């Protein structure tokens, strides 16, 4: 069945236009709340990692690593939808989005700077890297993060930061993990 998806981008175009007063059909009220809801669940896994009793320690580490990567990814999306772009000159002072690290739903968080948000995202990426071990998933679990996802996200974040060498290095790690055939690249 073919459907008309012409309105699928309305949500993002309304954010871009800052059209809060007369939203069109398909525009979500408080669209940012969806992302913070996902962050809440990721924080719940991270905060309760010592209480997880099912599965091996390797499985638990993988799950917690995925929660860190998911939290970083949600902050990254929020920063790019609702914050200013990363610039080396403006990042330390320019306000972006609030970083959510815990489960407290009552606290009203102040906005963090662009630099603080990107530092938090990179911290979550490194936390995920230290815990995750699954290089690839079988098709039924293809929606889950893997070690390749960690490097892919790092590469994307570093590209947005203008750190070209670090972005290239992260992308190169993906290449080296995926392809074991001889290559002009040094994957050692």
Can you describe what each PLM-predicted range is?
Residues 8-82, 112, 130-132, 137:
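Conserved, well-structured interaction surfaces
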Residues 82-115, 119:
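Short coil/linker segments at helix-helix boundaries
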Residues 172-176:
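TPR/TPR-like (Sel1-like) alpha-helical repeat modules
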Residues 179-188:
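Single conserved hydrophobic/aromatic residue that forms the stacking wall/gate
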